Amino acid sequence: MDIILGIRVQDSVILASSKAVTRGISVLKDSDDKTRQLSPHTLMSFAGEAGDTVQFAEYIQANIQLYSIREDYELSPQAVSSFVRQELAKSIRSRRPYQVNVLIGGYDKKKNKPELYQIDYLGTKVELPYGAHGYSGFYTFSLLDHHYRPDMTTEEGLDLLKLCVQELEKRMPMDFKGVIVKIVDKDGIRQVDDFQAQ
């Protein structure tokens, strides 16, 4: 029951992921970070089967960083998302497919604009203004549809994210231990340490 949310605003992308790691009715960890920094301006959040998510995320992170070192070139968020989509598409045709859904948020330095991509475990990729995986989509898409504007500032995006998290806390039968929120903009990736949904 992982929660990952992404919102693209005027000059950044905001990604939020639940802190809880659960198995059945047990909470195994209450401070898990379900994101990986793939490059200085690209962040991936992931949800899915416990073993698959971490293994896949580390594999993607290592390969993107290896490419950057070999070629001395930072891949754009679009190029990173295409690589991730290709790996998931290859995986689904193997004997041991990854059961991983991802959101990739980044800032393209050449185009000077933020980008958000949603990719599911079948290798379907789409660029969106906002996205969610897991049960979070059922409860938050109506809020996002109603309140989202492409010209929102980062602060307005964080306020919209607070509305979404409040709705999840009210509607979901489980405690997901809050969310870790990260912002990707022209200056890089930073974590929002004082994010409170109340």
From Swiss-Prot:
Keyword check for Secreted: no
Modified residues (Phosphoserine): 76
Subcellular location: Cytoplasm; Nucleus
GO biological process, one term: proteasomal ubiquitin-independent protein catabolic process
N-acetylmethionine found at: 1
Keywords per UniProt: Acetylation, Cytoplasm, Nucleus, Phosphoprotein, Proteasome
GO cellular component: cytosol; endoplasmic reticulum membrane; nucleus; proteasome complex; proteasome core complex, beta-subunit complex
Gene Ontology molecular-function annotations: endopeptidase activator activity
Chief location: cytoplasm
Misc. remarks from the entry: Present with 21800 molecules/cell in log phase SD medium.
Function text: Non-catalytic component of the proteasome which degrades poly-ubiquitinated proteins in the cytoplasm and in the nucleus. It is essential for the regulated turnover of proteins and for the removal of misfolded proteins. The proteasome is a multicatalytic proteinase complex that is characterized by its ability to cleave peptides with Arg, Phe, Tyr, Leu, and Glu adjacent to the leaving group at neutral or slightly basic pH. It has an ATP-dependent proteolytic activity. This subunit has a chymotrypsin-like activity.
Family in the record: Belongs to the peptidase T1B family.
PANTHER family documented for this protein: METALLOPROTEASE TLDD (PTHR32194), PROTEASOME SUBUNIT BETA TYPE-1 (PTHR32194:SF2)
Summary of subunit composition and partner proteins: The 26S proteasome consists of a 20S proteasome core and two 19S regulatory subunits. The 20S proteasome core is composed of 28 subunits that are arranged in four stacked rings, resulting in a barrel-shaped structure. The two end rings are each formed by seven alpha subunits, and the two central rings are each formed by seven beta subunits. The catalytic chamber with the active sites is on the inside of the barrel.
Name used for this protein in its record: Proteasome subunit beta type-4
